[in-house]
From Swiss-Prot:
Key word Nucleus present: no
Signal peptide residue numbers: none
InterPro entries, per database record: Ribosomal_uS4, Ribosomal_uS4_bac-type, Ribosomal_uS4_CS, Ribosomal_uS4_N, S4_RNA-bd, S4_RNA-bd_sf
Disordered as annotated region, ranges: 15-42
Taxonomic source organism: Prochlorococcus marinus (strain MIT 9211)
Protein's gene: rpsD
Protein name listed in UniProt: Small ribosomal subunit protein uS4
Role noted for this protein: One of the primary rRNA binding proteins, it binds directly to 16S rRNA where it nucleates assembly of the body of the 30S subunit. With S5 and S12 plays an important role in translational accuracy.
Alphabetical UniProt keywords: Ribonucleoprotein, Ribosomal protein, RNA-binding, rRNA-binding
Molecular function as annotated in GO: rRNA binding; structural constituent of ribosome
Superkingdom per UniProt: Bacteria
Amino acid sequence: MSRYRGPRLRITRRLGDLPGLTRKAAKRSNPPGQHGQARRKRSEYAIRLEEKQKLRFNYGISERQLVRYVKKARSLEGSTGTNLLKLLENRLDNVCFRLGFGPTIPGSRQLVNHGHVTVNGKVLDIASYQCKPGDVISIREKKGSKKLAEGNLEFPGLANVPPHLEFEKSKMSAKITGKCEREWVAIEINELLVVEYYSRKV
């Protein structure tokens, strides 16, 4: 399953607020489709599926990519759910989003893919790159790159930069000083339900 490229508000009406996907809020709280009918009680499977979809749409990844992240999270020490969130938070496109370089994760991915971002002084156009402590993430020293980021920094998608990102706004550069803690993950998600969803599938 590839990345979703349809109407984003349709997704947020169904799944709730997804700060990585869009900064717009759905005007109607009811899910898309026909209305007025009583909703059936959701099964445990449906609840787990919804949490999985939240994660996938918020970070803008395909089903295949998410499966790979789940497998990787299982191989690491500690809680699989927490490991999964940290892997997604460490993606270069997400780090750029958290710094305010892009208005959303898709917008930040576009900056990366078009060569506007450097890691440790070198242009890196791989949005899935796993950022690690010590990495320096910057906007490329080009007028066009700076102008794009400046416009986004005036109205960042999220108000607060996580404490593990040492950000110098004037230089449009940040150093990763540690790991992203669970409480700084922006999306409201029950990661344990995501792990349970994949328990018999992966």
